Design a protein with these regions (language model features):
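Terpene synthase/cyclase
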Residues: 1-555
Length: 555
């Protein structure tokens, strides 16, 4: 019997909503059975040898173009984290000599664009004006460059690293896209066509690192100048990291079962999908604890979201919100049984996380965690009031609430404490008001979510989303509203790009995690509700990332 049905405190005459979510497709016993052969000292020795060979490549490669390409390939293969010092040394040197008037760079669109993208990606402040030599006196893109497809592709990717107030590359992007699409339709170069089509679907800057690595490893095999050592390192590293992720997933799955939340019939049992979010945000194997905690947070928040969105009455939701604000188990008897289960699961898990941080870092963070949960529950309650009062907010009013109900601000505040040591007073002060490095990715998640899920959610009778609010504000068509949301996503990314090089109390690692969260949302909702409906493309991605190792030929 499900917990919500096992209580005399619930009035059986209440008519409750149902979202008819399908049950999880990932069986507990199946998850616990996951095992990898890619563990142990033999594989560690093998990968250390390969890393040594690649390190030697950094010392041997002196051609500036080859240096850039090596960094780019290592990043796309998902193994650049092994070579951070070597990459930093090369990019630091390139930044120091960036204005030296390199003739090769001025003449090569490809070299200029790749260097610009890599430097911007790694936080170096280089000007967009470096591309002016590729425009004529009328400020139009020089036509002869249209035959340079690799250069055009590199320019397209570079254009997504612009910041607020920059428009040179943005203005030429439509022109570049037009020519790249024509190339795909006409060319017989299979590898380059594959790369162009992939980029046009979603730019590299917006892609999830781990998922991109899995895709690029297969694509790289078809490249004429493929380096066998790089490929071997990437394949082995992917499988070894997958083994770590499997152990993480198994532990999170055991925790989830212990909470009993998976037995709530109205809520989504999406522990695997939440682990996919966590792995997209924090990929590297050494961050196992942080990844597991992020997945647990996501699973809790998915359930609480369903309480407010689907099952709870307005009176019950007000009681639950008050309980979270008080953060006190003594008032739990006022809650129906199913909400007691929910509250205790949140209370115990969050207090344990705070205790871990106190032990490891000497900082009592429970007040910040309590604030995060109170903020999101109050915002959930506001949306519930909109629903019960059949109220359609303006787009501005909607977004002021809905960026919080993505749960991303709450998750990222927790994540800061997981990932950071030492924790600084300056950062704590900033977290109180949700700085832009937290706020902006949350907006992207909200807009991506609405683009992917609003149609299905409206059919279930849910609140209007950003698309419908904009249509109501402006009398726009649905397609016009969708285009506007995509525009807002693009504008927000430009602001994030600037935030990541601005002076900040937050580490580069934390900033990267905040961007990764935005990236996960764009693939999770790219073709619909990848979080709520786990048996489509999400299933294939879970299979590729956590279950199926890359086949490696035995020597």
């Amino acid at each position: 019997m499900a917990p919500e049905e096992n209580s005399s405190t619930i009035d059986s005459t209440i008519v409750r909503r149902s979202a008819n979510y399908h049950p999880t497709i990932w069986n507990y016993d199946y998850i616990q059975s996951l095992a990898s052969e890619y563990m142990g000292e033999a594989f560690t020795r093998e990968i250390d040898q390969l890393k040594g060979e690649v390190t030697m490549m950094f010392h041997k490669v002196v051609d500036p173009i080859k240096q850039l390409e090596l960094i780019d390939i290592l990043q796309r293969l998902g193994v650049s984290y092994h070579f951070e010092d070597e990459i930093r040394r090369i990019l630091e040197n390139k930044h120091n000599t960036y204005h030296s008037g390199d003739v090769c760079k001025k003449q090569s669109l490809y070299v200029t664009a790749v260097e610009f993208r890599l430097l911007r990606q790694h936080g170096y402040d280089v000007p967009q004006g470096t591309f002016k030599s590729f425009f004529n006196e009328e400020e139009n893109f020089k036509e002869y460059l249209c035959v340079d497809i690799e250069g055009m592709l590199a320019l397209y990717e570079a254009s997504f690293h612009l910041r607020d107030g920059e428009s040179i590359l943005e203005e030429v992007r439509d022109f570049v896209i037009k020519h790249l699409k024509e190339y795909v339709d006409q060319s017989k170069d299979q590898y380059l066509c594959t790369m162009v089509s992939h980029a046009l679907e979603l730019p590299l800057h917006w892609r999830v690192i781990r998922l991109e690595a899995r895709w690029f490893i297969d694509a790289y095999k078809n490249r004429e100048d493929m380096n066998p050592t790089l490929l071997e390192l990437a394949e082995l590293d992917f499988n070894m990291v997958q083994a770590v992720h499997q152990e993480d997933l198994k532990e999170v799955s055991r925790w989830w079962r212990s909470t009993g939340l998976g037995d709530l019939s109205f809520a989504r049992d999406r522990v695997v999908e939440n682990f996919l979010w966590a792995t997209g945000a924090i990929t590297q194997p050494q961050f196992a604890y942080e990844r597991r905690m992020l997945a647990k947070l996501g699973a809790l928040l998915t359930t609480i979201d369903d309480v407010y969105d689907v099952y709870g009455t307005l009176e019950e939701l007000e009681l639950f919100t008050n309980a979270v604000e008080r953060w006190d188990v003594s008032g739990m008897e006022q809650l129906p049984y199913y909400l007691q289960i929910c509250f205790l699961s949140v209370y115990n898990t969050i207090n344990e996380m705070a205790f871990d941080t106190l032990k490891e870092k000497g900082c009592n963070i429970i007040s910040y965690m309590k604030k995060g949960w109170a903020d999101i529950c109050r915002s959930y309650l506001l949306e519930a009031n909109w629903f019960y009062n059949r109220y359609t907010p303006s787009l501005q009013e909607y977004l002021e609430c809905a960026w919080i109900t993505t749960a991303i601000p709450n998750i990222l505040v927790h994540c800061y404490f997981f990932i950071t040591n030492p924790i600084t007073e300056e950062a704590l002060d900033s977290l109180e008001e949700y700085p832009d490095i937290i706020r902006l990715p949350s907006f992207i998640v909200r807009l991506a979510d609405d683009l992917g899920t609003s149609t299905d959610e409206l059919k279930r009778g849910d609140n209007p989303k950003s698309i419908q609010c904009y249509m109501n504000d402006t009398d726009a068509s649905e397609e016009e509203a969708r285009q506007y949301m995509r525009f807002l996503i693009s504008v927000t990314w430009k602001t994030i790009n600037g935030e990541c090089i601005a002076s900040s109390p937050f580490s580069k690692t934390f900033n990267e995690i905040t961007m990764n969260i935005a990236r996960v949302s764009q693939f999770m909702y790219q073709h619909g509700d990848g979080h709520g409906v786990g048996d489509g493309e999400t299933k294939d991605r879970v299979q590729a990332l956590f279950i199926d190792p890359i086949p490696i030929a035995k020597n």
